[in-house]
Amino acid sequence: MVQSHPRRGHFPAIRTKRVLDLSRSEVLDAVDADQIAYYRARAPWYDDGYACAGDYDGGAEQNARWLAELAAVERALGTAPIHGDCVELGAGTGYWTERVIERVERLWALDAAPEVLQTARVRLGARATKVHFEVVDLWRWEPRRRWDSAVAFFLLEHVPDEVLPALLATLHDALHPGAPLFVAEGAANDAEPQIETRSIDGRAYDVVERRRSPSEYERVLATAGFSVVSVAARRLMHLLATRE
């Protein structure tokens, strides 16, 4: 059974998981479209997850652990050598964008959902003048320039194994040699690629949920031409890599 939730947008407490054959292009395309539609619909309450609000409120102890994990990622970001012209893959509502723009000259914020980018634009206010917002389906990304650094927060866990190598290879080619890449993701919780079916207002959406281990990321990044410099993993994982 797929649990639905009201328009207020709380994340379903119960999620239906299944494995689909994403090697079939028609299945992959359908999941891509569904996932984009899901995040467009979820845009108004996306930040509940960061704020421990609504169905994300796990009580004082659990919320404190979650906020401590976010703070650890933010501290690691603060020491990462991101600089110059930077690209953020899957910028979402701008929670991390506003932390990145303090460190770089200019930022390109990419996301497939225009609604979340609009939220980011409002969040940033006058600081948005440093940001170029672009609606991009990253599963089919064709960049037309190069950047000095890159960041991705909680994006790659929503990219299936069938797409991730090509995405990272594309990112590699879009970065200058030696460019740093900072990544934050949920820690690995399952060895199998999963599709989660989530429901909003009675409509079910298929969303990729593929949390990889640090060793998996090291392997796929190395294949794409990156060297992992450091990695830390608890409830959340963050890593720093360099474009070779």
Walk through the language-model features, giving the residues of each.
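A short glycine-rich, Lys/Arg-flanked "PGG" loop and its adjoining helix->strand segment in the class I
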Residues: 165-177
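A conserved beta-strand element that flanks and buttresses the S-adenosyl-L-methionine
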Residues: 151
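Class I (Rossmann-like) S-adenosyl-L-methionine-dependent methyltransferase catalytic domain
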Residues: 2-3, 7-86, 92-145, 159-163, ...
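Short catalytic micro-motifs in class I SAM-dependent methyltransferases
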Residues: 154-158
